[in-house]
Amino acid sequence: MPETSATTNAAPGVDHARIIAQLATEIGARASQVASAVELLDDGATVPFIARYRKEATGGLDDGALRTLEVRLGYLRELEERRGAILESITQQGKLTPELQQEIATAETKQRLEDLYAPYKPKRRTRAQIAREAGLEPLADAILADPACDPAALAAQYLNPEASINDAKAALDGARDILAERHAENADLLADIREHLWSTGLLYSKMVEGKETDGANFRDWFDFNEPLRTLPSHRILALMRGRQQGVLELRVGLEADLEAETPHPCVVRIASFLKLGNGLFALDATPRARWLGEVCRWTWRVKLLTAFESELFGRLRESAEAEAIRVFAANLKDLLLAAPAGPKTVLGLDPGIRTGCKVAVIDRTGKVVDTATVYPFEPRRDREGTIKTLAALAARHKVELIAIGNGTASRESEKLVGDMMARFPDLALTRVVVSEAGASVYSASETAALEFPDLDVTLRGAVSIARRLQDPLAELVKIDPKAIGVGQYQHDVNQRELARSLDAVVEDCVNAVGVDVNTASAALLARVSGLNTLLAKNIVAWRDENGAFPTRDMLRKVPRFGEKAFEQAAGFLRIPNGDNPLDASAVHPEAYPVVERIVARIKADVRHIIGQREALKGVSPSDFTDERFGLPTVRDIFAELEKPGRDPRPEFKTAQFKEGVETLNDLFPGMVLEGVVTNVANFGAFVDIGVHQDGLVHISALAEKFVKDPRDVVRVGQTVTVKVLEVDVARKRVALTMRLNDAAEPARRGNGAGAGAARGADRGARRPQADNGKGAPANSAMADAFAKLKR
């Protein structure tokens, strides 16, 4: 496949070969692999389709590499387009030299391109331009050229009253402006200072006067500094939120900033980089040296300081947002791929106090078969009536699982259900606490209204809770991922990039599992490779009118379901118990002829070999490769024949919260509890232990060994055993550890100082994580800033 053909969506004039080579280097692949992947993407193929069904073309690039390629492809194409536009602009100005052309041609980032373009970029009339128009550029050049000159004497030769240059000072000021602008547009100097600031700079934070009380959550940063290069993403976003709320004042600087009498390090760097000579800042400096020193100071203070501070803040935010989005995406993936309970009859209970608990029963297919509202708590306190109602519903519909939302009154509801189960043991029920994050958003959504037009909004939440136990993926795709609540500072990051990343995660998860085309909702179908909202609705409408699809081939009957959509979607759409057993597998219809050859070799019906590993023992995948289907695809076919429609999700398990532990007041240091990981951040993991307030396991308390990334140890939805270290009821803080040998702190019941609240506890760069220590870890004060995470 020619490498230069693989960019049909790129703008004319873009260097295709350069993009392919760059991408190949970045993802560690061959140029031919990248070229094939790019061509497939440009042809409308999706990442899941390419990863699963075009392994020969891409050399087996997985979905992670393809997602990276997809994002970087867009950036590099924009870079090439910008490169072309800059070259054209400078050429039209008649200022493009061979050296400049080479510099632009080898620039690898947008930042470098813009630095090179700065002197030639059309701009408003500046002080330097006014000085040039007054004839002062020769003065500036003369001072630079003559080490022995007296600037004031030279300046007297350049007076120009018509341009308001009436004395030597005015002339020297104009010359200074010209040189300052020239220096500030020197691409190599900018790159040097930028890297120096990033590698040695610090972020300083101090409290805005009078905000000590209002900004209590940010008190760890009232007098704080940390090197830019070591600041973790969550701390950057917390500091920037503090600035946005008017509590913190931030600035970027160097340690030497504090020494007011000495020249700023960047001023010295400017002088050194431009080879302006030694002694510019000495007490006995010559008039020329003193003047050039002032030019360097002016360049820094007036032209560069504010711009670089803004740029560095932007760089900090960009890197922090990228990491926060990565964490959110990883957590979302874990949540979507959580273990499904499967086709079981489930009673969903959405706890409430004053307005009552909403109840919905769904059958094994997810269909709502009954609803009720019960009032076991204040003000009615009809506990007995509630128990009888729940038991009657469970008996009538042969309920197997009870899903209890983890919001308000969750533990009280769980205890109520436990009492009901103890009174009616023959019902053989299992209770499970389920995250209800996003359930209220779904209840009031257009999707829910279309799905349940006759069902009260408040009851839809109970249905969602029940269904997300039955099949988390199928239910959670109906909710905006941002409403599910597994991100850090999700409202503070670039919303467009967040949406793009989360959409990619949802698409990858849905296609990794596969979708039953005869039972899936339109919301789930819309996430299948090659489909969209319109096609998904058309599939559901056709299904409602004509009944279940007997074969994948019948999908072609759906309006607007063309060959391209069929190619991209068919392998991910499953038809259990259909006319063709292969339609229930991940074998793509285009590869059915390969299966026919396998069946012919074995001399058996396909129904007799599916799921029968023994039947395939006498044949090898290599015997069935051809020009179209290589060994990777044929191996995948064999794997599907051995275990068709395999589900990548784990086995369903439930956590059991400890009886009698329902509020923060029930917790004491030293308690060992079972809980469920609800969120993973860079500084640790939040765990639901059944007290309405998630506890925090700091990264240093996740394991006996050093942990770099919490996700190496825990995942959202994972059941874990933890020990309570500290409890601070007043501030609703619980410090936990998964190192069960850690010593618990003495009980603190409300003085506001416990559970990792100590000043500066989050300054991870200054307090290295213990490697194998047995002491209680310094728990992160970031729990404050992340309190909103659970909303």
Curated annotation (Swiss-Prot):
Name all S1 motif domain ranges. Answer: 670-739
Disordered as annotated region, ranges: 746-791
First and last residue of the signal peptide: none
Q: Which InterPro entries match?
A: HHH_9, NA-bd_OB-fold, Ribos_protein_bS1-like, RNaseH-like_sf, RuvA_2-like, S1_domain, S1_Tex, Tex-like_central_region
Which pairs of Cys residues are joined through disulfide bonds in the record? none
Q: Where is the composition biased (Basic and acidic residues)?
A: 760-769
One of the GO BP terms on file: translation
Q: Which PROSITE patterns match?
A: S1 (PS50126)
* Keywords, ordered alphabetically: RNA-binding
* Lineage top rank: taxon: Bacteria
Q: Which GO terms describe its molecular function?
A: mRNA binding; structural constituent of ribosome
Q: Which CDD domains does the entry link to?
A: S1_Tex
PANTHER family assigned to the protein according to its UniProt record, in alphabetical order = 30S RIBOSOMAL PROTEIN S1, S1 RNA-BINDING DOMAIN-CONTAINING PROTEIN 1
Query: What does the UniProt function comment say about this protein?
Result: Transcription accessory protein. Exact function not known.
Q: What is this protein called?
A: Protein tex
Question: Which gene does this sequence derive from?
Answer: tex
